[in-house]
């Protein structure tokens, strides 16, 4: 009977540590999700800023005169 009680206590201890680990991992996942959301927002803002930049005066590749060897 004593052995069974010891096994139960060991299992309860392991369960408590696992619950703590799961909670810590959950908090990390929440932080990472927030970070990803912030980075997505920043990327979106950067894309919008890049699209607002006026095109340069340089001709595009399709408008360039081919080099003389063509």
From Swiss-Prot:
Coiled coil: none
Cross-referenced Gene3D superfamilies: 1.20.5.300
One Pfam match: SlyX
InterPro entries: SlyX
HAMAP family: SlyX (MF_00715)
Family, similarity comment: Belongs to the SlyX family.
Protein name according to UniProt: Protein SlyX homolog
Lineage start: Bacteria, Pseudomonadati, Pseudomonadota, Gammaproteobacteria, Alteromonadales
Gene designation: slyX
């Amino acid at each position: 009977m004593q052995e069974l009680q010891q096994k139960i206590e060991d299992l309860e201890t392991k369960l408590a540590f696992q619950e703590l680990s799961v909670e810590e991992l959950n908090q990390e996942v929440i932080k990472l999700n927030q970070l990803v959301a912030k980075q997505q927002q920043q990327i979106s803002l950067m894309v919008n800023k890049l699209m607002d930049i006026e095109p340069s005066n340089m001709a595009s590749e399709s408008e360039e005169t081919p080099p003389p060897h063509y």
